[in-house]
Amino acid sequence: MPQLNPIPWVFLFFLVWLVLGFLGLQKFTSIVTTTLDDSSEEVEVKSKEYSWPW
């Protein structure tokens, strides 16, 4: 079995993890921003509809 050069494999390994981390972070930030936008809109709507709940 021939001896493989480890440098390209290490580079590809880190490149794949960098891409996966970037995509995961992008997905996570999009979910967080949508939930924050939804919650802020709900708070505004609730405060307008039910200003005095009792």
Curated annotation (Swiss-Prot):
It is a single-pass membrane protein. It holds the Pfam family ATP-synt_8. The chain crosses the membrane at residues 9-25. Disulfide bonds: none annotated. The lineage of its organism: Eukaryota, Metazoa, Chordata, Cephalochordata, Leptocardii. Mitochondrial membrane ATP synthase (F(1)F(0) ATP synthase or Complex V) produces ATP from ADP in the presence of a proton gradient across the membrane which is generated by electron transport complexes of the respiratory chain. F-type ATPases consist of two structural domains, F(1) - containing the extramembraneous catalytic core and F(0) - containing the membrane proton channel, linked together by a central stalk and a peripheral stalk. During catalysis, ATP synthesis in the catalytic domain of F(1) is coupled via a rotary mechanism of the central stalk subunits to proton translocation. Belongs to the ATPase protein 8 family. GO terms for cellular component: mitochondrial membrane; proton-transporting ATP synthase complex. One of its GO terms (molecular function) is proton transmembrane transporter activity. It comes from the Eukaryota. InterPro entries: ATP8_metazoa, ATPase_protein_8. Keywords: ATP synthesis, CF(0), Hydrogen ion transport, Ion transport, Membrane, Mitochondrion, Transmembrane, Transmembrane helix, Transport. PANTHER family: ATP SYNTHASE PROTEIN 8. This is ATP synthase protein 8. GO terms for biological process: proton motive force-driven ATP synthesis. It comes from Branchiostoma floridae. It is found in: Mitochondrion membrane. The gene is MTATP8. F-type ATPases have 2 components, CF(1) - the catalytic core - and CF(0) - the membrane proton channel.
